[in-house]
Amino acid sequence: MSLIPATILTGFLGSGKTTLLKRVLTEAHGQKIAVIENEFGEENIDNDILVADTNEQIIQMSNGCICCTIREDLRATLQDLAQKKRKGELNFDRVVIETTGLADPGPVAQTFFMDDEIAESFLLDSILTLVDAKHAASQLNDRQEARRQVGFADQIFISKADLVSKDELDALTHRLRHMNPRAPQKVVHFGEVGLSEVFDLRGFNLNAKLDIDPEFLKEDEHDHAHHDHVHGEQCDHPSHAHDPASGAGHHHHHDDDVKSFVFRSDRAFDPAKLEDFLGAIVNIYGPRMLRYKGVLNMSGTDRKVIFQGVHQLMGSDLGPKWADGEAKTSKMVFIGIDLPKDIFLQGLEQSLV
């Protein structure tokens, strides 16, 4: 049985996840989609909206977050789905996990790599993050979960853009790009997106494609001075999170704790040195490293080495050969929470041949 693709749909409370999901479920695409819903709270309100006119099977896990309390439940649900599909009791092509607005997508993503049984049945395709343009400024300022959701994204959809001015939208896209230069951004109205922008994005594939927003690279040339704010690491879950409905103003560059930086070099890496260094930083900073990916020039091979990771989980693979005349430039992007950029860049520099 080929692996079942899974998509994690995340985004802050009220950002339009259910609207997007409903569109995906009702569109005539001929795919059978199993949805795992996990809204925060005793009652699941989305149920009434979703079940109205779709015949998809919706598996609900109410009563807590995937990220902390019921991680076990997500694994059990995925195992149950895979088993039923194998036995022919259920027929579906892919899985969408809609996380609660308070969830950190990290542990959800890790489930697909850490659990052998899950990894034998499912392939994590991508993490999609919805951002509510109207309330993004206050949510990103006040909630680390919102910043993490942006940091983890393979694709960012911006909703409610019609409720803010062009300047406010520009400020938001600029801010999101600084937090995550890997994820393309798209403005969506009422969940209207093409399926090709939702499925089969291969965000977790170890492939040679490392998309970094070219605008980000331009800005990266001159570094911004940062004064860091310290935010707690705990995943705290108030039973109700009320966000002040403040507009998305602020044109200055926000000093978010979720930041990204890029390392580039035309010199080859020494494989042993690089392995030692990456092992050490993942050991120390793993919990704060949200996503990282690179296309590397390693001494001793004429092929590109593709590497990527989530928190402490890291993998690498041989990619295609460097083309004739192609500049053998290593490029790595790190997205994380207050990572010590200087230590990373210096250590990578020292791992070169």
Segments (PLM) and residue ranges:
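Structural motif
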Residues: K87, A119, E145-R148, H253
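A secondary-structure boundary/capping signal
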Residues: L9, I36, D132, S159-K160, ...
